[in-house]
């Protein structure tokens, strides 16, 4: 490691060099302006001398690298607010031009060139080479025997271009004329960065020999090579003009197509090629009538699978190869990466070092960026393609991954920045490093410095929060589109590398991207959090509160422009905000340790970590199946979903998660937006989901017996249902047959399973006839998982964490197998297997229901199987009935038995059913016992588990787009239902009768406490002294208002009202607060004006609407002739406004005393309650609402001015009683008084 950064820096004084300090000269008379800057500089920028486009682009590097090591001219863009002595009218917008000088950085009173390498640098450096110059200390020659690999690259080298490197002849032969080279990137135990270039790996594919010979008239393998070379030379373009038959090698082997039992072994040509590009062209274009096999397998996968024991993440050892050949060290001037040492070798020079499990001292960078729009509207959402929208700060935290120690804190700032003393003291008190503040005059210099840090320090792992969808795309777009900086040299490769972001689609209105950087593994904690935990909001602050019990000092985005323009002290507040974001993300990273689980999946699947993160579940199973198929003599055919290699292209159809996996609701998926985007759904049998086309019937769900159950409900769960079905019934591509004659020589039932799926008969041979490849994979994985879990109790805490991540990774891959077969456009689809799995699952649910109902219908039958049941009898009649079945869970209602006894006996009952009905390894397990259960609908229930814990599934009691008042009331009602035995008993009695009966009779007396909550809620809603903040609703502005299809949304109404009032409008991704107000004449007039404003905005060009100079007047309505339908006087009745039109900004409503719409809020409360409690009334929402309203008095709500007059006249409001009888007595008394 080559370090170039110091410790705490002295604070800058008046004489210190500061970014933009005296740099800009305000416009004025000749000779006017500030005095000389603190440090002497030349070529001060004048925006009027060199406008954009009049100068040449910055000169690029001339060495064998493409990162910037020299730069003497660049495009200069900086906000005018940094010119703090200029008059206010001159401080809007940005400076934009070209500047002739080296990029500068200022830190702690010092100034230096960004690209200069030397002692005393401002940031740490680990790279040995910079700009073609070796900066290693004298005598630096580390010995490398053992090294850890974390990433694997592949590229194509040409012998002609590598002659000067003085490689050994065997390496030159491997790339003559071209050849694929696998590069292993890693770290030695001593911390030296190493790159091992492995020569001799070749990709290959298969074609049926008989078909090839018939179509191409081939008599020998060489003939096939000649035909392929000729086809390539005749291809469009000049890429393959020099191809000859020597580029290929063909041999004849015996293999079996993996599809169908009746497929017999045959002879195939195995064709080796020297580059993935040639392979891809041949598989796509050479003799399309001939089926290709395994043509989409990249070189990295071949390297791992063709060398038994090799892994994508783990320890390797260099050793002598065949004929005692040794690995060849590369001379520093021949390095292709920013490593400390590089070697050339072949695969036989490598061996796995199995005795080491710890990770070396890899480095983790956690970063966050802050941006600001620079146009006329500084509150607009920044767009990377706009030169005036700038990155103003970047926080960078550098950790040691093995020790979790935070080693460096860096803050890149556009303009001068003074962090608050309180923040520095807080960091010091926590034992964290003092931040190093790096200041810059222009955005280019700051971005170049950041990328230079990325190159020189070279963190192996990078994390942040939503960096894949925002931070990295914004930075890369800035660098490539605005500043024309080549990025292919900023990963571990010095040139011809990959540093790219792909947009791979939308999810819940949220853009989804993937990133690939050579030698840098990006793990976005936003994706990790949304996968691991379910929260109502995934904003970083909400996640920190829920997971870390920590809370950041939030800074509103709309405050950033003002803070930034004020000066260094306020820019320091932004810097503190930026640093604390990175600190929180770092804490989340070490809380979840995602790299351990991801690396375990990568090792198991034989793919690198980047593919594990971004390439879905399909590739994980495919590579494992590919390895096993080769061992068993099978080959896998290419499909439409053939995956690409590490060359960078993303799969055409990225695989989604399994349909039966629960996905957390993402930030921004508000109810109104789901309604807006809603449309007709496709039929159940043919769904397309993020690239998945599923063409078979899904899992069986036994319809729930909705209601409130106060007797114990035992929940049995199938352990690993789908994997166990595949194992038990030997399901696979290779054991399937669609033809009865193919299994005619076998004995039905004994030798094969016959099953009808979707009206078609399918046959699967048993394991003794041919063992399923999928079963072998699952058996080996589960045995490995069991062995790993058994080691955890005896392990050290550190090793236990690693082992737990490994067993979790195996579980994830096992659960991917079923989904792998069921994706029609996947890598190796077999819908018959997937459909058979779900069919057997449905039959198992039905068989379990029939068995339980028949076997334990009477208590005596239960006693016969379980004598201990005699001690668990509870008062009341006995019965056992299944009330719900959902894919892999069965809910059994047990009357007359105690919850404690059922909990103790549940596993025995599950084992009994498993032995009686299912083949191993299928087994039921007792998952939990509910003491009370409100079963609402499929996948929606609330229950209290034996022991007191409440479990809520599919029901949002606390919704992020509901107001606090409704959320609190809903939760209070649920707690009352489950924890008040009087209410629970009354609710159970209520649910046992048809809902219609309660329309004509009083509700049970035990519901009085339940009704009291509703009465109190109604009182608080109608209370003139209510706190309006309790009634604020929110919705996310997921995109620009102009991009919404449905404009009649409450939060859009507020957006346009704010714009009309020339107030600060929310930015995209902000949650817009609003309240629903009463309809008044003033509200009606505002709505009319807003309609005109919406029309103006819809017609306006550009990305952001400009506020109107004056509010548009509503369109004049023509005089109407009074009709018989009009009210007296001829005035037409006002239109009842939509709820979305009644939305108002809470701050405006409070300031102007705007009345709330109490009817709306109570209806909203009743609606929320009905969704949850309709199960008490036969799931009839209309009857539920009608009965709940019984608790509330029918009262007239006069307008506020009328109510004030009534109170002044001595009238008072009389509330309703808690019951209908009490209300009747009060009314009787009132009428007697009036009489």
UniProtKB/Swiss-Prot annotation:
GO terms for molecular function: DNA binding; DNA-directed DNA polymerase activity; nucleotide binding; RNA-DNA hybrid ribonuclease activity. Keywords: DNA replication, DNA-binding, DNA-directed DNA polymerase, Endonuclease, Host nucleus, Hydrolase, Multifunctional enzyme, Nuclease, Nucleotidyltransferase, Transferase, Viral DNA replication. PROSITE patterns: DNA_POLYMERASE_B. Residues 640-693, 1098-1134 are annotated as: Disordered. Residues 650-661, 676-691 have a biased composition (Basic and acidic residues). SMART domains: POLBc (SM00486). GO terms for cellular component: host cell nucleus. GO terms for biological process: DNA-templated DNA replication; viral DNA genome replication. InterPro entries: DNA-dir_DNA_pol_B (IPR006172), DNA-dir_DNA_pol_B_CS (IPR017964), DNA-dir_DNA_pol_B_exonuc (IPR006133), DNA-dir_DNA_pol_B_multi_dom (IPR006134), DNA/RNA_pol_sf (IPR043502), DNA_pol_B_thumb (IPR042087), DNA_pol_palm_dom_sf (IPR023211), DNA_pol_type-B (IPR050240). Its main location: host cell. Residues 662-675 have a biased composition (Acidic residues). The keyword DNA-binding applies. It catalyses: DNA(n) + a 2'-deoxyribonucleoside 5'-triphosphate = DNA(n+1) + diphosphate; Endonucleolytic cleavage to 5'-phosphomonoester. It is found in: Host nucleus. Pfam families: DNA_pol_B, DNA_pol_B_exo1, DNAPolymera_Pol. Its EC number is 2.7.7.7, 3.1.26.4. Replicates viral genomic DNA. The replication complex is composed of six viral proteins: the DNA polymerase, processivity factor, primase, primase-associated factor, helicase, and ssDNA-binding protein. Additionally, the polymerase contains an intrinsic ribonuclease H (RNase H) activity that specifically degrades RNA/DNA heteroduplexes or duplex DNA substrates in the 5' to 3' direction. Therefore, it can catalyze the excision of the RNA primers that initiate the synthesis of Okazaki fragments at a replication fork during viral DNA replication. Belongs to the DNA polymerase type-B family. Forms a complex with the ssDNA-binding protein UL29, the DNA polymerase processivity factor, and the alkaline exonuclease. Interacts with the putative helicase-primase complex subunit UL8; this interaction may coordinate leading and lagging strand DNA synthesis at the replication fork. This is DNA polymerase catalytic subunit. It comes from Human herpesvirus 1 (strain KOS).
């Amino acid at each position: 490691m080559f370090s170039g950064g110091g410790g705490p820096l002295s604070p800058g004084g008046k004489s210190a060099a500061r970014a933009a300090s005296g740099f800009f000269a305000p416009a004025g008379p000749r000779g006017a302006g500030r005095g000389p800057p603190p440090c002497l500089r030349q070529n001060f920028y004048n925006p009027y001398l060199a406008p954009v486009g009049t100068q040449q682009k910055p000169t690029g590097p001339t060495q064998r690298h493409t990162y910037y090591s020299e730069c003497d001219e660049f495009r200069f863009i900086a906000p005018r607010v940094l010119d703090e002595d200029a008059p206010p009218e001159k401080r809007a917008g940005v400076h934009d031009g070209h500047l002739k000088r080296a990029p500068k950085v200022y830190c702690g009173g010092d100034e230096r060139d960004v690209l200069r390498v030397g002692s005393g640098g401002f940031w740490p450096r680990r790279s040995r080479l910079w700009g073609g110059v070796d900066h290693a200390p004298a005598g630096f020659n580390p010995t490398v025997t053992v090294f850890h690999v974390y990433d694997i690259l592949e590229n194509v080298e040409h012998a002609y271009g590598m002659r000067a490197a003085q490689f050994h002849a065997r390496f030159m032969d491997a790339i003559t004329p071209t050849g694929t080279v696998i590069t292993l990137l890693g770290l030695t135990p001593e911390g030296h960065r190493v790159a091992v270039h492995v020569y001799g790996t070749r990709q290959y594919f298969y074609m049926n020999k008989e078909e090839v010979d018939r179509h191409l008239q081939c008599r020998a393998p060489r003939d096939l090579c000649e035909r392929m070379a000729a086809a390539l030379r005749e291809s469009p373009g000049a890429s393959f003009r020099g191809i000859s038959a020597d580029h290929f090698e063909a041999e004849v082997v015996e293999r079996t197509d993996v599809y169908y039992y009746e497929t017999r072994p045959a002879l195939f040509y195995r064709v080796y090629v020297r580059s993935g590009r040639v392979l891809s062209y041949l598989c796509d274009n050479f003799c399309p009538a001939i089926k290709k096999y395994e043509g989409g397998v990249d070189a990295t996968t071949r390297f791992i699978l063709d060398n038994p024991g090799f892994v994508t993440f783990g320890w390797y050892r260099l050793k002598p190869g065949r004929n005692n050949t040794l690995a060849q060290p590369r001379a520093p001037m021949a390095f292709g990466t920013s490593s400390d040492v590089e070697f050339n070798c072949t695969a036989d020079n490598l061996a796995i070092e199995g005795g080491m499990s710890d990770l070396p001292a890899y480095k983790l960078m956690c970063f966050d960026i802050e941006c600001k729009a620079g146009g006329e509207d500084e509150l607009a959402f920044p767009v990377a393609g706009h030169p005036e929208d700038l990155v103003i700060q970047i926080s960078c935290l550098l950790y040691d991954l093995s020790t979790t120690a935070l080693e460096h804190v860096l803050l890149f700032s556009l303009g001068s920045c003074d962090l608050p003393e309180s923040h520095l003291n807080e960091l010091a008190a926590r034992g964290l490093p003092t931040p190093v503040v790096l200041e810059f005059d222009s955005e280019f210099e700051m971005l170049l410095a950041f990328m230079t840090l990325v190159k020189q320090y070279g963190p192996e792992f990078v994390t942040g929060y939503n960096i894949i969808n925002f931070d990295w795309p914004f930075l890369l777009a800035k660098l490539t589109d605005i500043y024309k900086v080549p990025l292919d040299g900023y990963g571990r490769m010095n040139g011809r590398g990959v540093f790219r972001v792909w947009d791979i689609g939308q999810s819940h209105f949220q853009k989804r991207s993937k990133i690939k950087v050579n030698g840098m593994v990006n793990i976005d904690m936003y994706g990790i959090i949304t996968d691991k935990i379910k929260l109502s909001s995934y904003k970083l602050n909400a996640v920190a509160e829920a997971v870390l019990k920590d809370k950041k000092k939030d800074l509103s985005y709309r405050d950033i422009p003002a803070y930034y323009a004020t000066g260094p002290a306020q820019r320091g507040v932004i810097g503190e905000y930026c640093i604390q974001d990175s600190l929180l993300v770092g804490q989340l990273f070490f809380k979840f340790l995602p790299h351990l689980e991801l690396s375990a999946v990568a090792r198991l699947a034989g793919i690198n970590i980047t593919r594990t993160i971004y390439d879905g579940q399909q590739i994980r199973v495919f590579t494992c199946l590919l390895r096993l198929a080769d061992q068993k003599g099978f080959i896998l055919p290419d499909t439409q979903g053939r995956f690409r290699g590490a060359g960078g292209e993303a799969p055409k159809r990225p695989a989604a998660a399994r349909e039966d996996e629960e996905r957390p609701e993402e930030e921004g998926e508000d109810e109104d937006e789901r309604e807006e985007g809603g449309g007709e759904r496709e039929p159940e049998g043919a769904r397309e989901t993020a690239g998945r086309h599923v063409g078979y019937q899904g899992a069986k769900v036994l319809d729930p017996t909705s209601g409130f159950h106060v007797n114990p409900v035992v929940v049995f769960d199938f352990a690993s249902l789908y994997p166990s079905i595949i194992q038990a019934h030997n399901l696979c591509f290779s054991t399937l047959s669609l033809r009865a004659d193919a299994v005619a020589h076998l004995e039905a039932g004994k030798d094969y399973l016959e099953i009808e799926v979707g009206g078609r008969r399918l046959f699967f041979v048993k394991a003794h006839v041919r063992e399923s490849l999928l079963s072998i994979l699952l058996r080996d994985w589960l045995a490995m998982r069991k062995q790993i879990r058994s080691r955890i109790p005896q392990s050290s805490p550190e090793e236990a964490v690693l082992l737990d991540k490994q067993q979790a990774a195996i579980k994830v891959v096992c659960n991917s197998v079923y989904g792998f077969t069921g994706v029609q456009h996947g890598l190796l689809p077999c819908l018959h297997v997937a459909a058979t799995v779900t069919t057997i699952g449905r039959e198992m649910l039905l068989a379990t229901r029939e068995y339980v109902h028949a076997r334990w219908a009477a208590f005596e039958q239960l006693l016969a199987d379980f004598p201990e049941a005699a001690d668990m009898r509870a008062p009341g009649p006995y019965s056992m009935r299944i009330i719900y079945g959902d894919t892999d869970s069965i809910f059994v209602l047990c009357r007359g038995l105690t919850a404690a006894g059922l909990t103790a006996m549940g596993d025995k009952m599950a084992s009994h059913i498993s032995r009686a009905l299912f083949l191993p390894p299928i087994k039921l397990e007792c998952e939990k016992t509910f003491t009370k259960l409100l079963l609402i609908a499929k996948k929606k229930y609330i229950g209290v588990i034996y022991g007191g814990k409440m479990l809520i599934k599919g029901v949002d009691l606390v919704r992020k787009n509901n107001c606090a008042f409704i959320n609190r009331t809903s939760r209070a009602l649920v707690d009352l239902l489950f924890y008040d035995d009087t209410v629970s008993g009354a609710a159970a009695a209520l649910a046992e009768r048809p809902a219609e009966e309660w329309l004509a009779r009083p509700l049970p007396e035990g519901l009085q406490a339940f009704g009291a909550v509703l009465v109190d809620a109604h009182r608080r809603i109608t209370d003139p002294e209510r706190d309006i903040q309790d009634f604020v609703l929110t919705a996310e502005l997921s995109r620009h208002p102009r991009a919404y299809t449905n404009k009649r949304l409450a939060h859009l109404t507020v957006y346009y009202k704010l714009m009309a009032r020339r107030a600060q409008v929310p930015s995209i991704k902000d949650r817009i607060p609003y309240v629903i107000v009463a309809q008044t004449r003033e509200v009606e007039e505002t709505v009319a004006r807003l309609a005109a404003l919406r029309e103006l905005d819809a017609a306006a060009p550009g990305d952001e609407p400009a506020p109107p100079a004056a509010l548009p007047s509503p369109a004049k309505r023509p005089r109407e002739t009074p009709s018989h339908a009009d009210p007296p006087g001829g005035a037409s009745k006002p239109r009842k406004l939509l709820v979305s039109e009644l939305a108002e900004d809470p701050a405006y409503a409070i300031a102007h005393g705007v009345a709330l719409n109490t009817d709306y809020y109570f209806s909203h409360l009743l609606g929320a309650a009905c969704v949850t409690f309709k199960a008490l009334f036969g799931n009839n929402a209309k009857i539920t609402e009608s009965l709940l309203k019984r608790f509330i008095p029918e009262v007239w709500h006069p307008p506020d001015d009328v109510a004030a007059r009534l109170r002044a006249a001595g009238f008072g409001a009389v509330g309703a009683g808690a019951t209908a009888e009490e209300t009747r007595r009060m009314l009787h008394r009132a009428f007697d008084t009036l009489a």
